[in-house]
């Protein structure tokens, strides 16, 4: 192409490349903190508009894993869904009636009572959302191997190792792609 056209796109291309490099580097810093652990680092859907596929690719380049690309990739019942349905049992019951048995259902929990309710309805994945470490430790003990466990909320480079040590399978970090 012409020099003029190349120069027009140069800054945009460099900005995108720098952003993705930053995402991959930050992801790798988190992954290094998990070294020796079986816990996997996940991204979230909190991405820059129009850059989701690139940011999620950058996460994998940094050694992390993608959680979901979009809402259709998995069923995650968040606090507002649970409230609207009148509780976890009702929410999961409604979902099971409307979806294939092969779809995994993830339930966001904030308390030990919610964890127990998610276990009663046989949630496939239980997210411990914004729990303090002591409560999360108790939740992991209650869940055992009855469901996969994801920790989310207030995760930093300083806290990720201690979170992994309580036995969660996954830790999701929105800050990887959402600054």
Kindly give the residue locations of the regions a language model identified.
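Acidic/glycine-rich phosphate/pyrophosphate-binding loops and surrounding catalytic core
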Residues: 1-121, 125, 134-142, 148-150, ...
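Short secondary-structure boundary segments
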Residues: 130, 153, 175
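Cys/His-rich Zn2+-binding cysteine-cluster or related metal-binding knuckle/ribbon modules and their
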Residues: 157
């Amino acid at each position: 192409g012409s020099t003029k056209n190349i120069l027009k796109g140069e800054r945009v291309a460099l900005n995108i490349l720098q952003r993705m490099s930053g995402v991959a580097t930050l992801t790798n810093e988190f992954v290094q903190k998990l070294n020796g652990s079986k816990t996997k680092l996940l991204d979230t859907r909190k991405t820059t508009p129009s850059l989701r596929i690139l940011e999620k690719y950058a996460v994998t380049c940094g050694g992390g894993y993608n959680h979901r690309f979009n809402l259709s990739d998995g069923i995650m019942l968040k606090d507002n869904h649970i409230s609207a349905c009148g509780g976890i049992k009702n929410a999961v019951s409604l979902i099971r009636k409307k979806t294939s048995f092969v779809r995994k259902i993830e339930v966001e929990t904030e308390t030990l009572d919610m964890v127990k309710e998610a276990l009663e309805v046989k949630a496939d994945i239980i997210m411990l959302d914004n729990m303090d470490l002591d409560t999360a430790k108790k939740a992991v003990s209650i869940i055992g191997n009855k469901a996969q466990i994801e920790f989310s909320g207030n995760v930093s480079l300083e806290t990720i190792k201690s979170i992994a040590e309580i036995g969660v399978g996954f830790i999701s970090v929105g800050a990887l792609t959402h600054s």
